[in-house]
Amino acid sequence: MVENSYVLFARLCVELFHELPPLPSDESHGDITTFERLFLRKCRIELENASPKTEHLPLVYVDETNYYRFIKTVRVLAEVYKNSKITETTRKSMIQVLMNPILPPERITDAMNLFRSIIGKLADFHFSDEKFNQLVRSSRVVELEGNYNEEVKLRKEAEDALAMKKEDVEMMEQLLESYKEEQGKLQLQAKALEHKLEAELRHRKETETLLAIERDRIEKVKIQLETVENEIDNTRLKAEEFERKYEGEMILRRESEIALEKEKKELEEVKLKLETYEREQENLSSEVRTWQDKYEQESSLRKLSEYALSREQEELQIVKGLLEFYNGEADAMREERDKALKTAKEQMEKRQPPSSFFCPITQEVMKDPHFAADGFTYEAESIRKWLSTGHQTSPMTNLRLSHLTLVPNRALRSAIEELV
């Protein structure tokens, strides 16, 4: 019986090798758990615990051939486990041989239930040599019948393929005829496209001519634009030159004032303040003109300072000569000088700064005047505070400022420093 069981298991192993897929294992080592391993373990547990027999088999749709194979496998397993005709090691080896799929995945659960329900009944079945040989012969007949059915199926598929091939040949002939007609149409279309291409080439030549004329015009405009840019650069250089001249005049003016103060030691309390300019230009036409005006003003101031210095030197020489010859008249001259100083101080106290010295926001004399985009001059701290609070309009005109850049008004600042 054991030898016949080995033969049957070997045949079933070959026939059922690709029938059932392996199941992923939940174990840490990652081995594949097969369906046979699962239901054989269930079979052993049921037989050892003498589970109750199931009367009715579940309704499971299984292919007839696979179903008979399944029943044969179950019967042999039941006989082996019940009678214990082989050792535990041999049974484990047989189980390892049978660790291959039998049914599709969707039928795994039903097949397991079917096996568990019938394993108790089939375990009581006793095989005789005649019945076992008949079982083997019937399995061989089923195998031959399956092979014959497979051959018939393949022959039918070959005949269908031949019929489809004939249809494809007829279709290719029809396509060839239609291709010839299409070729004639394409030749006509090619001639039409050739005429269209010639017209397109003529149009392209005309377009290229117009494009060349337009390029010449663009080149002329570029030359004009470069000329304008050069003029702007020259104007900017002139502005920088006038600014440098203005700064040089300021340095010369300070040197002249220092020299004047040295020459007038005896008259140092008398300060003749010359008002250079007291007006404010609300709208500057250009930066070049502004610096040019400042340069001319500073030049005139320097000339006046030099003239005043020379006059003071002459007067000082005359005074020194008179002091040498007229000691008596020196006291009178000193009294007259004191009176002149007193009169000058009174005039300076009565004199009020011009309105251009006051900030339109704070209404106080400015210390750091700056130009804004609206053309007005403001105290730097006040106008920055106005802009930082979110205002983008002029405090004087209430119009939107074109930009928020502030420019120092150096000329006005110098005039304020001289007067105050």
Curated annotation (Swiss-Prot):
Pathways involved: Protein modification; protein ubiquitination
EC numbers: 2.3.2.27
GO molecular function: ubiquitin-protein transferase activity
Keyword Heme tagged: no
Species in which this protein is naturally found: Arabidopsis thaliana (Mouse-ear cress)
Name the UniProt record assigns to this protein: Putative U-box domain-containing protein 58
Taxonomic placement: Eukaryota, Viridiplantae, Streptophyta, Embryophyta, Tracheophyta
Reaction equation(s) it catalyzes: S-ubiquitinyl-[E2 ubiquitin-conjugating enzyme]-L-cysteine + [acceptor protein]-L-lysine = [E2 ubiquitin-conjugating enzyme]-L-cysteine + N(6)-ubiquitinyl-[acceptor protein]-L-lysine
Pfam families on file: U-box (PF04564)
Function of the protein: Functions as an E3 ubiquitin ligase.
Domain MIF4G: from-to ranges: 4-168
Coiled-coil ranges from the UniProt annotation: 139-352
Annotated U-box domain residues: 352-420
Transferase as UniProt keyword: yes
